[in-house]
C-alpha cells in the first residue's frame, strides 16, 4: 500500500467570483470524490461539510489498519469496509489487520523500541490499534449524526498518540 495524500476539501465548488467565464469553467455540478471515500449523504444532495471530511478520514483509518481499499473486489453485494471491520471488532480484529501493523510482526533483529519489554509493547500497541479502529468506525458511520465532530476526532487522535510511547518524540 502506498502513501496517501488527502484533500477532501477539493470536493467543493471552486468558484467564488461573479464572472460568468470563471463560473462556467470552474463550476462543479455537485461534490466530487473517490468512490468509497466520499460521504454517502453527498449522493442525496447534502451540502459539503466537515462531516463529509470526518467520514473520509474514518475510511482512510480503516483502510490503513486492514490494508484494503474500500473499492477492493471483496467489498460487493452490500459488504463494505465499515461492515467488514465492524463484524470483527474488537474480539477478532487481529484476524483482519494488515499483518505489517500487528504487534509481533517485525523484522529479525528489530527492537520493540523504548524501555518497554516486548509483551508490554505489544499490549500498548494493540490498545492503540483498537482505539484507532474504534475511531475509524465512528468516523465512517453512514449518517453524520452518528459521527464525532472534527474536534472530537482531533482530541482522540492526540490521546492515542500520547498513550503510545513509541510515537513520542
Tell me what each language-model feature is.
Residues 1, 5-169:
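Cytosolic eukaryotic protein kinase-like domains
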Amino acid at each position: 500500500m502506498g502513501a496517501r495524500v488527502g484533500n477532501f476539501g477539493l470536493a467543493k465548488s471552486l468558484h467564488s467570483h461573479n464572472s460568468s467565464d470563471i463560473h462556467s469553467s470552474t463550476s462543479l455540478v455537485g461534490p466530487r470524490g473517490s468512490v468509497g471515500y466520499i460521504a454517502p449523504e453527498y449522493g442525496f444532495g447534502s451540502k459539503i461539510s466537515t462531516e463529509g471530511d470526518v467520514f473520509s478520514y474514518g475510511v482512510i483509518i480503516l483502510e490503513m489498519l486492514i490494508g484494503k481499499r474500500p473499492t477492493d473486489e471483496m467489498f460487493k453485494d452490500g459488504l463494505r469496509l465499515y461492515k467488514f471491520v465492524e463484524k470483527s471488532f474488537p474480539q477478532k480484529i487481529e484476524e483482519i489487520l494488515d499483518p505489517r501493523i500487528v504487534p509481533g510482526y517485525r523484522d529479525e533483529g528489530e527492537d520493540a523500541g523504548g524501555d518497554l519489554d516486548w509483551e508490554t509493547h505489544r499490549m500498548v500497541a494493540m490498545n492503540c490499534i483498537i482505539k484507532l479502529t474504534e475511531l475509524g468506525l465512528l468516523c465512517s458511520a453512514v449518517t453524520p449524526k452518528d459521527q464525532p465532530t472534527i474536534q472530537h476526532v482531533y482530541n482522540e487522535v492526540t490521546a492515542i498518540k500520547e498513550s503510545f510511547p513509541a510515537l513520542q518524540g
